[in-house]
Amino acid sequence: MEAAAPLAMNREDAGESETMALPLNGKDEAQVNTAGRAASNHETGGHETRDRGEVLEPGRALAIADFAPPSISAGERLIRLAYRFGVPGSALSSPLGKTAKPRILSTVASPRPGRRQAGVALRAGHFLINGVKAPIAQMDFSPKARLTPPFEHTVHGFGWLRDLAASAPRDQVIPTAERVMAAWLEENAKPGKGPAWSVENTGNRLLAWLVHAPLILSSGEAQLRGQVLAQMESTARWLDRNIRSADDRLGEVAGWCAITAAGLLLPEGHPRRLFGEAGLVRALGELVADDGGVLSRSPLAQMEAIGLLVDLTACYAAMKLDPPQAIETMKSLLVPPLLALMHRDAGLGNWQGGGAVSADRVAALVEASGVRARPLKDVRQWGYQRVVADKSVLQFDAAPPPLSRHSRSGCASTLAFELSANGQRIVVNCGGAALAGGQVPVRIEQGLRATAAHSTLALDNANSTAVLLGGKLGSGVTEVEVDRRTLSSL
């Protein structure tokens, strides 16, 4: 059995909100000085010790020095700088030649898994999003449509292409893909505003188009093919200009992945690829903490980040190029924290708005990543302690909630736990706040983020950290002290 070396987790975003979750006595407590820093270490049997009272700074992202952009020549640095300031890629790639016609340079084979059930539903004529069926014929694809977040993400992010590809051979799904694509283009001929043109949805959309191009470019209709290719190029240019207006770091990473993929797969893309790689490495360093967990502490966001890098790596493979080492290193960092949230049934726990993700989905994503690793043991900002004894698994939220600027479905779950044994879940949290807008009603989303929706003690029916609108969190828990040690069993 194990317990862990003393560790203090800090959250210092009280200034981001005036709302207090619990009355504070106003008593100032001196911070404990840090005498040492633990090394990131996965469950490899090694033992690292921390001095008692070490304080982890809240949400420390990786430093840029941890993940430097790929090494390039002085000439390429000038090209990247010129492209960043708006010089067209065609002028930098072939200044004396004609502009190349839009086309896809190679076919991508991504191992990123789709959901077959959702793909079958699409072929039957409706979207299947978080358990809700929505007929394609009745879907409003316009930028001004009032859709719930899960529908916005799926419909405008084109993640459904991945599901469709997983449901049947290519020739059987092309008609459905082109039908939905044509309907979307009719309402979104030019870049606009609203959820359809958020950086995240736009980045996911362009990346899906590039990865699954055969599904939307195999028609005999030259007009549709021309429209799709033109839309790819204009979308890539839009992302070049608007990437820094992303709502959060995960959305920015999606945008940078799409820019880099466009640089790989569209003609005259070398300047764009240089621009995209540098931006992506920087954004990844700001998304992920030094133990490999995303700063939102959300397993769903962790899975999304891994999936984006899997798709992008497949784009490099399609062009017979090696991805930057930083991308491979980041994938290796992202997988162990996700595995730390696996129960005995190999599915994920319900944390920070996520639901009980099935074992099959987790296994398929980890296999697609190509990373073989054990669950993260030296947990820092990720905050979830995992204790294994025989056939039982205990998961414990031993950290303050994520900072408001990082959270999308932030939950007041400090000191909550989940327990499973023999493949059965014994104690669980409610979870599901991030899924609100499907079968989970939007009206209860805020309640699912409350302390009372988690398996922990609630004092006076108050949240341990203030739960605000829009997935944000206010003041409350700022520090959690953990004492974990390995004990010999009797």
Could you describe each region identified by the protein language model?
Residues 413-476:
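Active-site rim segments in enzyme catalytic domains, especially the processed small/beta chain
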Residues 289-432:
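Carbohydrate-active enzyme catalytic cores, enriched for enzymes
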Residues 380-391, 463-490:
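Extended, loop-rich substrate-binding clefts of extracytoplasmic carbohydrate-active enzymes
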Residues 2-9:
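Extreme N-terminal basic, low-complexity initiation segments
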Residues 10, 16-29, 33-36, 41-134:
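Extreme N-terminal leader/anchor segments
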Residues 149-331:
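Aromatic-lined, polymer-binding surfaces characteristic
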Residues 156, 255, 383, 415, ...:
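Residues that flank catalytic or metal-binding motifs in active/ligand-binding sites
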